[in-house]
């Protein structure tokens, strides 16, 4: 259903959003929780309406329409205030899928309307995503995801995006896998886009987004882009495709589906599909023109999200998927052309009936030309015919992949079963049949290539003959007699018809070969099969060349790394030696510092000793003067001894005189006093001799300390000179 008026669209989409939230209101969050494609499309539609209204005078009105929509009889704005509760205990209040969807969408809408500065948006989203991490950690709902709309992304700087990415990458317990993948894509896309001239740009309203790599559908849904938006690509991107819609689920399950896609031949499209509200609407970009080593989203498992959220796989778990040949190619939608009216001619087979799905037959009305009216329509003769293969179980080129995979599985099974396994015979028979099938497939492919070359040759010949016929007719129109030229024209026409018949026979043979390979009677288009085969072979060849280049680069990088490792080992040895030398120097420096400190103390002590030495020298000088005096006094000692002997003589005489009674008492008294003076002087001289010996020993000690200090000062000076050099 197509809607045009913005207010009408906003009213309808607000009602759809409220209905979807109400339906999911009581679904408790768990590890199995996830949003269906219908729910994701409903979210995208309402966010697109709000984004479009930002450049009009209707933005407040669209927001009011959304706020006044009711859920269980209560307006959305009141419900949002209740579950948000000013950010208090949010993880306990948002415990169901419906509340989760309402909380995220209303937060994004409020941010779009009220914030325009990147710092304000970043601050809000930082708090918001921390709440999201708390919710995911509490309930383990890793598959729940509602990404940031493009209207907010384009206002953020790459530093803000990296910081928001770190919110999820550092919260290992949050289990927010898709949010992490979303910001990882934005980070990779930014740095690849800044260094490349290749790009695909998608835009609507005032928002646009460019990428040089494939863009998965969940990224496009988060950014709110649809296949009806304006698409522009650089001219060097030749193999780019836009997926637009899910056609049906494979094998009656939701594990895998068939999708419609449009090959982007032109550089600009005003949308490749109609603007509808279909639940099965899809939008993803597949870019096969860029190196697969930098495009991690090329794999079909990552590009197109399955309906069952728990079947979603991460990048590290996926295997190569080549099921793109199962999808349907459709022409780009042109709103200026009327919608095509097709009649399938057959009914859609029931889910339980029939072993094979039949292709859609396109019935064309007969031409007014009688020759064309009497024979059935052959699409191979129509130059405007666009072949469409639908519900193909497997493409011709994929048979080789299937055979290789089966042989690999059989080899693995044979290794596990061993030589004495009970299935050895069956395994050998299966491998033999696969080998025969592989040989037959190679033979058929060689025949197909031969027929292709013959077809090109015949086509060129037909063009050449057609040109000659035109020249002959031009000559005939300029002459009166054209009988000879008429015969030539008839002959040429016969040759052309024979060439066309042979071409039809070869095409018929090619169809038979293809039907044999496909093991069934199929009325599909040979040309389409050949086109798919050539495209697949070219893609495989490109992938192989890319892998060879990648391997060569890896080997070169490995050799460079080995050289770097050797150099690093050498540097490591030098570093260890340097560390040892540095540690030795550090220990020496520590020792020197301690010695310097000790020498500084000794220097202080030396100054004290010097002062003491000066004092002692002064005392020594005094003592020397006294010693000289004592020496002079010692000279008097002999006189004293002589005096003593004289005294003894006098005493003897005195004694003799007293005994004899003839002495003079006065003379005796005088002599006794002189003797006393001499004895006093003698005692003083003895005391001076003792003091002199003590001072001499003290002088010897001080001289010894002075010599030690001088030697220490000389050693310190030499050490300081060595450290300085």
UniProtKB/Swiss-Prot annotation:
Coiled coil in keyword set: yes
Biological process per Gene Ontology, one example term: viral process
One Pfam family in the UniProt entry: Pox_A_type_inc
Localization per Swiss-Prot or TrEMBL: Virion
Location of the region described as 4 X approximate tandem repeats in the Swiss-Prot/TrEMBL record: 609-718
Keyword Cell cycle among UniProt keywords: no
Quaternary structure and interacting proteins, as annotated: Interacts (via N-terminus) with protein A26.
Name by which UniProt lists this protein: A-type inclusion protein A25
């Amino acid at each position: 259903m197509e809607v045009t008026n913005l207010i009408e669209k906003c009213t309808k989409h607000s009602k759809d959003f409220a209905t979807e939230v109400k339906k999911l209101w009581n679904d408790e969050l768990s590890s199995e929780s996830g949003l269906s494609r219908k729910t994701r499309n409903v979210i995208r539609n309402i966010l697109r309406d709000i984004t479009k209204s930002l450049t009009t005078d209707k933005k407040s009105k669209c927001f009011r329409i959304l706020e006044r929509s009711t859920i269980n009889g209560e307006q959305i704005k009141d419900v949002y205030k209740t579950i948000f509760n000013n950010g208090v205990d949010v993880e306990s209040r948002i415990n169901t899928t419906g509340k989760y969807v309402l909380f995220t969408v209303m937060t994004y809408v409020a941010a779009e309307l009220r914030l325009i500065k990147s710092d304000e948006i970043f601050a809000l989203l930082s708090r918001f995503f921390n709440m999201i991490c708390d919710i995911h950690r509490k309930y383990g709902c890793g598959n729940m995801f509602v990404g940031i709309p493009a209207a907010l992304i384009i206002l953020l700087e790459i530093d803000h995006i990296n910081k928001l990415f770190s919110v999820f990458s550092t919260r290992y317990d949050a289990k927010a896998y898709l949010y992490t993948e979303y910001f990882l894509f934005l980070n990779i896309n930014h740095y690849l886009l800044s260094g490349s001239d290749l790009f695909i740009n998608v835009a609507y309203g005032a928002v646009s987004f460019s990428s040089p790599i494939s863009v998965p559908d969940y990224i496009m849904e988060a950014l709110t882009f649809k296949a009806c938006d304006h698409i522009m690509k650089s001219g060097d991107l030749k193999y780019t495709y836009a997926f637009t819609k899910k056609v049906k689920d494979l094998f009656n399950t939701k594990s895998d589906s068939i999708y419609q896609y449009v090959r982007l031949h032109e550089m600009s499209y005003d949308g490749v599909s109609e603007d509808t509200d279909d639940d099965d609407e899809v939008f993803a970009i597949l870019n096969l023109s860029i190196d697969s080593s930098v495009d991690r989203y090329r794999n079909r498992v990552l590009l197109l999200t399955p309906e069952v959220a728990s079947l979603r796989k991460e990048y590290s778990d996926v295997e190569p998927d080549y099921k793109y040949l199962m999808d349907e190619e459709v022409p780009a939608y042109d709103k200026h052309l009327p919608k095509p009216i097709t009649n399938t001619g057959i009914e859609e087979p029931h889910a339980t009936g029939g072993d094979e799905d039949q292709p859609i037959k396109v019935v064309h009305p007969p031409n007014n030309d009688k020759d064309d009216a009497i024979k059935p329509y052959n699409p191979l003769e129509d130059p405007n015919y666009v072949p469409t293969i639908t519900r193909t179980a497997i493409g011709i080129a994929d048979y080789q992949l299937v055979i290789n995979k089966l042989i690999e599985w059989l080899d693995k099974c044979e290794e596990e079963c061993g030589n004495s396994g009970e299935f050895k015979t069956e395994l050998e028979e299966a491998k033999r049949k696969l080998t025969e099938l592989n040989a037959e497939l190679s033979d058929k492919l060689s025949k197909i290539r031969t027929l292709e070359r013959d077809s090109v040759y015949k086509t060129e010949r037909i063009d050449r003959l057609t040109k000659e016929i035109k020249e002959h007719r031009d000559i005939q129109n300029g002459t009166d007699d054209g009988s000879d030229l008429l015969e030539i024209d008839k002959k040429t026409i016969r040759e052309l018809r024979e060439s066309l018949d042979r071409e039809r026979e070869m095409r018929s043979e090619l169809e038979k070969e293809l039907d044999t390979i496909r093991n069934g009677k199929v009325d599909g288009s040979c040309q389409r099969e050949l086109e798919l085969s050539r495209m697949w072979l070219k893609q495989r060849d490109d992938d192989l060349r890319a892998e060879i280049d990648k391997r060569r680069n890896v080997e070169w990088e490995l050799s460079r790394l080995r050289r770097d490792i050797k150099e690093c080992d050498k540097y490591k040895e030098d570093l260890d030696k340097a560390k040892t030398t540095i540690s030795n120097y550090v220990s020496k420096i520590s020792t020197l510092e301690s010695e310097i400190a000790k020498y500084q103390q000794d220097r202080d002590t030396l100054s004290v000793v010097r002062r003491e030495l000066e004092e002692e020298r002064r005392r020594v000088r005094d003592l020397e003067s006294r010693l000289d005096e004592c020496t002079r006094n010692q000279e008097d000692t002999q006189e004293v001894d002589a005096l003593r002997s004289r005294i003894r003589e006098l005493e003897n005489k005195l004694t003799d005189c007293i005994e004899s009674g003839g002495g003079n008492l006065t003379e005796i008294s005088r002599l006794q006093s002189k003797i006393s003076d001499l004895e006093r002087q003698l005692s003083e001289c003895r005391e001076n001799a003792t003091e002199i010996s003590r001072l001499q020993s003290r002088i010897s000690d001080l001289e010894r300390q002075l010599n030690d200090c001088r030697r220490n000062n000389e050693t310190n000076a030499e050490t300081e000179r060595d450290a300085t050099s």
